[in-house]
Amino acid sequence: MNDTSDIKHTSQLTSGDFTEASEPFALFAAWFAEAVASEPNDPDAMALATADADGLPDVRMVLMKGYDTQGFVFYSHIASAKGRELAANPKAALLFHWKSLRRQVRLRGPVTPVTDAEADAYFATRPKQAQIGAWASKQSQPLESRFAFEQAIAKQAAKYIIGSVPRPPGWRGWRITPAQFEFWHDRPFRLHDRIEFRRTAPDAPWTKTRLYP
């Protein structure tokens, strides 16, 4: 086994006491704004965890494409592993980890598809090459070679030389509506700050609890 126990870690203190926050969405918005200003790459990247029919978890990085008090939105294809797993078990967990700030946010809850209008509106904002790629990619299916993929891209590009590219029928978005948040901030000597928010329904009040690190 490769021993990593001697890796040195540094801690950056927050300005102010985030543990006084009473509402998780406002706290997330404040932390995310700081991450956008501080994180060198992809502050909107989040780990998405789902589970298959046997309960075996899957996790992968995706990009958050929007959030509000209704939830957190991402896009993919219904034929992908995440799409299939969410169809069978529409619950998921997210993790944001901002190394530059020594912070992370975990949340989990039920998942629902966004409306076709929402998906169409977002797809229309994507670069044309990305739109064509969505048509060419049979996401998560076996691929013979990179060359075969490039041929599929060229074939789709030829179809849409002129005009807009419509959204593929299997390409959609999902919204995770949090039932639980946890905000974590690194502190020296592993004496971290952890604050949890829970609610029993989307319109229920939040209950806040401080957790041991």
Curated annotation (Swiss-Prot):
Gene Ontology biological process: pyridoxine biosynthetic process
PROSITE patterns: PYRIDOX_OXIDASE (PS01064)
Catalytic reaction(s) noted: pyridoxamine 5'-phosphate + O2 + H2O = pyridoxal 5'-phosphate + H2O2 + NH4(+); pyridoxine 5'-phosphate + O2 = pyridoxal 5'-phosphate + H2O2
Pathway noted in the entry: Cofactor metabolism; pyridoxal 5'-phosphate salvage; pyridoxal 5'-phosphate from pyridoxamine 5'-phosphate: step 1/1; Cofactor metabolism; pyridoxal 5'-phosphate salvage; pyridoxal 5'-phosphate from pyridoxine 5'-phosphate: step 1/1
InterPro entries linked: Pyridox_Oxase (IPR000659), Pyridox_Oxase_CS (IPR019740), Pyridox_Oxase_N (IPR011576), Pyridoxamine_oxidase_dimer_C (IPR019576), Split_barrel_FMN-bd (IPR012349)
Residues that bind substrate: 65, 122, 126, 190-192
Enzyme class of the recorded protein, top EC level: oxidoreductase
Record Pfam families: PNP_phzG_C, PNPOx_N
Record-listed FMN binding positions: 60-65, 75-76, 82, 104, 139-140, 184, 194
Gene3D superfamilies cross-referenced by the UniProt entry: Electron Transport, Fmn-binding Protein, Chain A (2.30.110.10)
Cofactor descriptive note: Binds 1 FMN per subunit.
Family: Belongs to the pyridoxamine 5'-phosphate oxidase family.
Role: Catalyzes the oxidation of either pyridoxine 5'-phosphate (PNP) or pyridoxamine 5'-phosphate (PMP) into pyridoxal 5'-phosphate (PLP).
HAMAP family: PdxH
Name this protein carries in UniProt: Pyridoxine/pyridoxamine 5'-phosphate oxidase
Organism: Nitrobacter hamburgensis (strain DSM 10229 / NCIMB 13809 / X14)
